[in-house]
């Protein structure tokens, strides 16, 4: 790149050959993708920095991979030639405050793209439509991290930590699945799921 990059490079496989491609974004928000030889595959100007790392998805269940990511104002899905997959990008009404979450509940490529706007979580399908079946109420304090999907036995849980120390464990519809009364210090907490 001609300008300094603003975050660590992201590696992902090129679907035709399996070779690793490298994505970087410079300080002017130009996303550039290079092949393993260092040759530029594409560059795309974005309206802001990518939040977190891009996610690799297979929208059409045909092994042709795409990159999904969010900036503070848009949800993007790009093909490996740099073109936006229609109908993306999706413009946000309010700024995105966390990296994009990508859920594939049944491992069937029926993705849910999860966006966080301060204390509101929205879910989008692969057609760029807001998922009407997900109705989470706004949290009382800002959301601390990207929502995460966990599967324990046959149940799905969406974990959403708040700055206040509250942890939400929700169902796929956004309803509280498990109520946690205790406050958690997320700054030092390392937690994991154990099954017996």
Each model region followed by its residue ranges:
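Extracytoplasmic/lumenal domain signature
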Residues: 1-196
């Amino acid at each position: 790149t001609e300008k300094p990059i603003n975050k660590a490079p992201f590696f992902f496989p090129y679907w035709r050959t399996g070779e690793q491609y490298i994505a970087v974004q410079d300080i002017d928000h130009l996303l550039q993708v290079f092949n393993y030889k260092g040759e530029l595959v594409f560059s795309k100007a974005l309206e802001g920095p990518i939040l977190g790392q891009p996610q690799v998805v297979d929208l059409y269940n045909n092994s042709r991979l795409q990159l999904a990511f969010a900036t503070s104002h848009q949800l993007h899905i790009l093909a490996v030639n740099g073109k936006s997959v229609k109908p993306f990008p999706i413009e946000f009404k309010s700024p995105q405050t966390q990296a994009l979450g990508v859920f594939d509940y049944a491992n069937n490529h029926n993705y849910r793209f999860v966006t966080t706007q301060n204390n509101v979580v929205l879910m989008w399908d692969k057609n760029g439509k807001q998922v009407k079946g997900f109705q989470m109420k706004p949290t009382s304090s800002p959301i601390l991290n990207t929502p995460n999907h966990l599967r324990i036995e046959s149940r799905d849980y969406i974990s959403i930590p708040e700055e206040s120390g509250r942890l939400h464990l929700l169902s796929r519809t956004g309803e509280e699945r498990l109520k946690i009364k205790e406050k958690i210090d997320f700054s030092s907490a390392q937690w994991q799921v154990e099954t017996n």
